[in-house]
UniProtKB/Swiss-Prot annotation:
Pathway entry: Cofactor biosynthesis; thiamine diphosphate biosynthesis
Protein name from the UniProt record: Phosphomethylpyrimidine synthase
Cofactor: [4Fe-4S] cluster
Binding site for [4Fe-4S] cluster: C578, C581, C586
Residues that, per the record, bind substrate: N236, M265, Y294, H330, S350, R351, G352, D391, G392, L393, R394, E430, Y457
Keywords noted in UniProt: 4Fe-4S, Iron, Iron-sulfur, Lyase, Metal-binding, S-adenosyl-L-methionine, Thiamine biosynthesis, Zinc
Cofactor note: Binds 1 [4Fe-4S] cluster per subunit. The cluster is coordinated with 3 cysteines and an exchangeable S-adenosyl-L-methionine.
UniProt GO cellular component terms: cytosol
GO annotation, biological process: thiamine biosynthetic process; thiamine diphosphate biosynthetic process
Pfam family, one: ThiC_Rad_SAM
Chain's gene name: thiC
Assembly and oligomerization: Homodimer.
Length: 638
């Protein structure tokens, strides 16, 4: 086992971080009702369309810039100074303080946290400026759901409304010149034409959406997860007992949000988990999730049977005081459900699920996560940590999909959701897994019913098991479908799934696949404004605005690199063809010529029937072109 260095190379860390804005893009901010609500977007500048009208110089027609949702934080803003050793500025600090329902603690509450703090050997691993943890005042509930149910619109809710409403804000100005969006099918979702702060509040109050914003993670930019909002994507990072370092994990965090991760889960299972998580949280503008049972297991040297409620409780408090925004807790794995997995092809594949199943069998007792669930809720609402109720019995192969064990646990998760909501604690529900395409929709339908429309958060699902090395592709297919049916957040899968710990490039590949899947789901639902991005790409493609195509691509770097592999010269970026078809066979160039012919020969475009050019005029055009061909020497290529 590789030992982690007991130091952090801050120079190496700073040099790893990618800070450059995307090509042709700038970070802009839209202000809300108060100066400290500044919502970031990526604005893509587009070049003019050249309109040819005869022999003279072409007329320029401006293309307005396109604004895109941006979760990359200040890392893509060259105007914002960043000091990784100090972390990001506390964006939400003033909002938390002005509510006057939290208090700074005199010190760290968890025994393990104090032990780490007092170990001089770890001094060089710790951040130099760790913030003082906060907790709700006695008797207070500081969850966003609690505020929402009291009718309070928080700054976080307004921030989210501006963020989610962006595409709608651009819609009116573009509809005059763009194709109308294709009609979507939302499967009875309640997606409004305009997102308001009141709509955000109402969705959170109903439990149909969550705002994962721990009071001890003031650096985070508010975001929302719910099926009536844009589909979100989560990326998993974290060290293992075999490999990785703090520098690597912080770099993977920043790399993940650059490529579109809306939340990040730290699934570290190696050394110095506490310190690694602190560096990640302090430098993260997106919500951070964890699976606390992983660290609790490390505290008992990997022996599941030695876990206790006291150790788990201390771990929850430790992580909540660091600022973790949501916990995956496998409280639905009950003793009675474990035998239901006996005849499965792949048994229990969830790490957290298998840990709790082993504990239940070792003690022949009900899980302490289930029996102590009310006590867990008390901790969650004191810090505003959101539940991500884990699917510990999810299928690990399509042979096991939608079986009795999976759905038994799902109904228990619905029961636990109701308990959490009595405490005004936010909840989302985790889902599979491995599910063949024809069974995907059943998962969403059953989850919406069993869990009262709490947001669904799924790992894929993979729709086939034959794709090791390409699981990001097979799972993105399932993700696009399950997102369309109503899943609120998709957990990415990388090419290394089932094979090894993902590296930097694997993280990017997984995220690109899943951002495409999420966008496809938004399009299919008919999410207002989602098609604007597609229209902008298509218009640039038809007009051979190559630079704009690269800028608008979900991965500009790769789009440009692929183009330049065969046509590297700068003049190729204004050419009306690419290396796929060449100058003679480009369908879009030919289509432009047909359009120009129709413009110059209006008499030749009289319609004999709707959408059909009169046959005589077509024949005339053919004869003219045939004559040109013969006079040109009858050569196919000149």
């Amino acid at each position: 086992m590789a030992k982690t260095r007991l130091t952090v190379d801050t120079n190496d860390l700073a040099s790893r971080i990618t800070r450059a804005p995307f090509p042709g893009s700038a970070k802009i901010y839209i202000e809300g009702s108060r100066p400290d609500i500044r919502v970031p977007f990526r604005e893509v500048t587009l070049t003019d369309t050249m309109v040819h009208e005869g022999a003279g110089e072409p007329r320029r027609e401006a293309n307005p810039p396109l604004r895109l949702y941006d979760a990359s934080g200040v890392y893509t803003d060259p105007a914002s100074p960043i000091d990784i050793t100090r972390g990001l500025p506390p964006l939400r600090g003033a909002w938390i303080n002005e509510r006057a329902d939290t208090e700074a603690l005199p010190g760290i509450s968890s025994a393990y946290g104090r032990e780490r703090l007092n170990d001089p050997a770890l001094a060089a691993l710790r951040m130099a400026h760790a913030p003082v943890p906060r907790r709700a005042k006695a008797g207070a509930n500081v969850s966003q759901m609690h505020y929402a149910r009291k009718g309070i619109i928080t700054p976080e809710m307004e921030y989210i409304a501006v963020r989610e409403n962006l595409v709608r804000a651009q819609l009116a100005e573009r509809l005059a010149t763009e194709r109308m969006p294709k009609k979507g099918h939302s499967f009875n979702a309640s997606i409004p034409e305009q997102i308001t702060a009141e709509f955000v509040r109402d969705e959170v109050a109903r439990g149909r959406a969550v705002i994962p914003n721990n009071i001890n993670h003031p650096e985070s930019e508010p975001m929302i997860i719910g099926r009536n909002f844009l589909i979100k994507v989560n990326a998993n990072i974290g060290n293992s007992a075999v490999t990785s370092s703090i520098e690597e994990e912080v770099d993977k965090l920043v790399w993940s949000i650059r490529w579109g991760a809306d939340t990040v889960m730290d699934l570290s299972t190696g050394e110095n988990i506490h310190e690694t998580r602190e560096w990640i949280l302090r430098n993260s503008p997106v919500p951070i999730g964890t699976v606390p049972i992983y660290q609790a297991l490390e505290k008992v040297n990997g022996k599941a049977e030695d876990l206790t409620w006291e150790i788990f409780r201390d771990t929850l408090i430790e992580q909540a005081e660091q600022g973790v925004d949501y916990f995956t807790i496998h409280a639905g794995v009950r003793l009675a459900y474990v035998p239901l997995t006996a005849n499965r092809l792949t048994g229990i594949v969830s790490r957290g699920g298998s840990i709790m199943a082993k504990w239940c069998l070792s003690h022949h007792k009900e899980s302490f996560l289930y029996e102590r669930f009310d006590e867990i809720c008390e901790i969650m609402k004191a810090y505003d940590v959101c539940f991500s109720l884990g699917d510990g019995l999810r299928p690990g192969s399509i042979a096991d999909a939608n079986d009795e064990a999976q759905f038994a646990e799902l109904h228990t998760l619905g029961e636990l959701t109701q308990i959490a909501w009595k405490h005004d604690v936010q909840v989302m529900i985790e889902g599979p897994g491995h599910v063949p395409l024809q069974l995907v929709k059943e998962n969403v339908d059953k989850q919406l019913e069993a869990c009262f429309e709490a947001p669904f958060y799924t790992l894929g699902p993979l729709i086939t098991d034959i794709s090791p090395g390409y699981d990001h592709i097979s799972s993105a297919m399932g993700a696009a479908n399950i997102g369309w049916y109503g899943t609120a957040m998709l957990c990415y899968v990388t090419p290394k799934e089932h094979l090894g710990l993902p590296n930097r490039d694997d993280v990017k590949q997984g995220l690109i696949a899943y951002k495409i899947a999420a966008h496809a789901g938004d399009l299919a639902k008919g999410y207002p404004g989602a098609q604007m991005w597609d229209n902008a790409v298509s218009k640039a493609r038809f007009e051979f605005r190559w630079e704009d195509q690269f800028r608008l691509a979900i991965d500009p770097d790769t789009a440009m690199a692929y183009h330049d592999e065969t046509l590297p010269k700068e003049n190729a970026k204004v050419a009306h063809f690419c290396s796929m078809c060449g100058p003679k066979f480009c369908s879009m160039k030919i289509s432009q010529e047909v359009r120009e012919f129709a413009r110059l020969n209006p008499a030749s475009t009289t319609l004999a029937a709707p959408g059909v050019i009169a046959i005589k005029q077509i024949d005339s055009g053919f004869e003219e072109k045939a004559k040109e061909f013969r006079e040109g020497g009858s050569e196919i290529y000149s």
